[in-house]
């Protein structure tokens, strides 16, 4: 939920807890378990699950390779589930005109740099930059261009805004911060 007043604008950023991430983590987990079960079935020379026949698969080398693929897929799935659990990439963008500070906060993986916070002054902002990529997916990116020519991205590539919403959001932010907008 976004909060907006005359001097303060806080927008929430969605991280890894998206339906698509849960879907793909589940697909990878089920696929990995299927590979492991078929590999183990070929080792035992007996079908563990009836709809995954393994009688025609010899353990060496096919069953062994399937076990390795299953273990690799299981660890990839584990990584995806932990990223979802920790909500990596979520956070907020805070624009405070009263104090003259912009604060960008994101959650990372556990460890020394779990909390990622970038703060800079509003007076250091040169412009709001809107970069549009006109390809099949027609994605855009909103970023803050600082006076030292450094760009700080505000939106993620996977955000589901269409181009007109992206332009409107960039224009609102430029009006709020009272800086120009540049785009290409």
UniProtKB/Swiss-Prot annotation:
Cellular compartments annotated: Plastid, Chloroplast thylakoid membrane
Chief place where the protein resides: plastid
Single GO cellular component term: chloroplast thylakoid membrane
GO biological process, one term: photosynthesis
Functional note: Seems to be required for the assembly of the photosystem I complex.
PANTHER family: PHOTOSYSTEM I ASSEMBLY PROTEIN YCF4, PTHR33288
Record-stated family: Belongs to the Ycf4 family.
Protein's name according to its UniProt entry: Photosystem I assembly protein Ycf4
Source organism of the structure: Staurastrum punctulatum (Green alga)
Phylogenetic lineage: Eukaryota, Viridiplantae, Streptophyta, Zygnematophyceae, Zygnematophycidae
